[in-house]
Amino acid sequence: MQSRELREQLLGCVKSRKSLHVTGPPGSGKSTFVSRLAEALRVKGCRLGGFMAPEVRRGGRRVAFKIVDIASGEEGYLAVADESLAAPGGRRARHGRYLVLVDEAWRVMSHAIRNAFEHADIIIVDEIGPMELAVPGFREALTEILDSGKPLVTVFHRRLRTLDPGLYKLLERGCIVWLDERNRGPLIRLVSEIASALSNEACGNS
């Protein structure tokens, strides 16, 4: 997709008050884009809610993923490869080499989503993937957000269409953007413009 087409798609999406959903291969810059967009929205006075799931590295090796509440900073582990990182107790689910800490993850997710519903202008979810969907309650909460019409920006797993066709159909109500090395630069350069359009549409104090 050419830069002009990408710009028109994204700004048209925002102005029509549709949700924005970003996907692509690992390392394509999805989370970087959403993080920079969140920073730009905060500068414009938007109240943000939701969560991000950053990776945790030790000695250059990925050992875990966390769940971090965007608004409060509350955090917990989503999944760990090294079980010594996990507190004892709580429900767990195996996903490849990772152990999903169901109860710990849901504690942070549920607080973040509930507070976002009540207080945020824009909800951000990074990401929607197999490990997040292994947490009971998350899919239902996400569906509620999608049905609410509240402004939403997500990152989702590139195979979600196969993993959960029903959820993918809900995302298709909004705008889906495929991010890869060809359009990463143009998309990052559009962050400020997208943030301005989003804040004008969604943020009452902007």
Swiss-Prot record:
Family of this protein: Belongs to the THEP1 NTPase family.
Highest rank taxon of the organism: Archaea
Alphabetical list of InterPro entries matching this protein: Nuc-triphosphatase_THEP1 (IPR004948), P-loop_NTPase (IPR027417)
Protein name: Nucleoside-triphosphatase THEP1
Role: Has nucleotide phosphatase activity towards ATP, GTP, CTP, TTP and UTP. May hydrolyze nucleoside diphosphates with lower efficiency.
Pfam families in UniProt: NTPase_1
EC number of this enzyme: 3.6.1.15
Binding site for ATP: 24-31, 122-129
UniProt keywords, alphabetically: ATP-binding, Hydrolase, Nucleotide-binding
Enzyme class: hydrolase
